[in-house]
Amino acid sequence: MKLDLKILDARMRDYMPAYATTGSAGLDLRACLDAPVTLQPGETTLVPTGLAIHLADPGYAALILPRSGLGHKHGIVLGNLVGLIDSDYQGQLMVSTWNRGQTEFVLNPFERLAQLVIVPVVQAQFNIVDDFAQSDRGEGGFGSTGRH
């Protein structure tokens, strides 16, 4: 799949989104910062990437997801948990960054911060019904299928 990418900050030419391995699902996104940013515990900030994409095809969307190492080791996750980039969005990719950890975290310029995953999208149409066809699960949820 070819994707239109606009470089909004010339410095990002040296830090293009890339797959870390041939098996990677996510492209690494980096913090386009002029100076380090310190996040105190519980603090959130919006971090620019210096990049914009245009998917154009409504059959696709992009997800901005946290990097597992930052979340596990430092408590750095996305403030909105998942960022959804619609196919018609053309603005800068921004990463809502939340320090849910117990200690301050310093985010350095051009540090890998999040990952971008391209996913297929189905735009559903609704069929209004009075009742659903019976299923084994029915309305059971929140652990109704068992613990193990």
From Swiss-Prot:
EC number(s) on file: 3.6.1.23
Keyword Hydrolase: yes
Catalysed reactions listed for this entry: dUTP + H2O = dUMP + diphosphate + H(+)
Signal peptide residue numbers: none
Enzyme class, spelled out: hydrolase
Matches recorded under CDD domains: trimeric_dUTPase
Family note: Belongs to the dUTPase family.
Name recorded for this polypeptide: Deoxyuridine 5'-triphosphate nucleotidohydrolase
Species classification: Bacteria, Pseudomonadati, Pseudomonadota, Betaproteobacteria, Burkholderiales
Gene: dut
